[in-house]
């Protein structure tokens, strides 16, 4: 089916809320860092299947990835996988980056949680009580977090949206299975509209 017309930056400007504790909490505005717009919007351009970003530290890569997750979960539900260098880093990212976004961005809170104010965001217990820090279900899709050194996680199920963070710090091989990005990318082959984002510093 055709993708909804809303781009990632349009979605973020309309819905995303930056949590307290960040440098600029409150409503997201892409205009604060205009260079992020083209990167985000590439994820919803027809015909683009891989977005590669090599950048300086602290330029908003995490927010770009979070906006991609939020936009797809809300408007175009899909199986989404985020890979961090290790499982421990994936757990930390889920607790410190994903959980606050789900808590503070209303449309995502409504998707991922059922009883407002009763969620345990630290352990990310969500819609059905069976979700975990590394696996979150929402209507029509799932967000999976895994480490680059975990072949079982990387090859577990088909995904349409793949986000790989700090690729330069990935394990050289996922067990005996080979390159982690190649292994995860094979999960996308059944989707004509798949897209992968590879980020490194």
Locate each region found by the language model.
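Phosphate/NTP-binding elements of NTP-utilizing enzymes
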Residues: 1-201
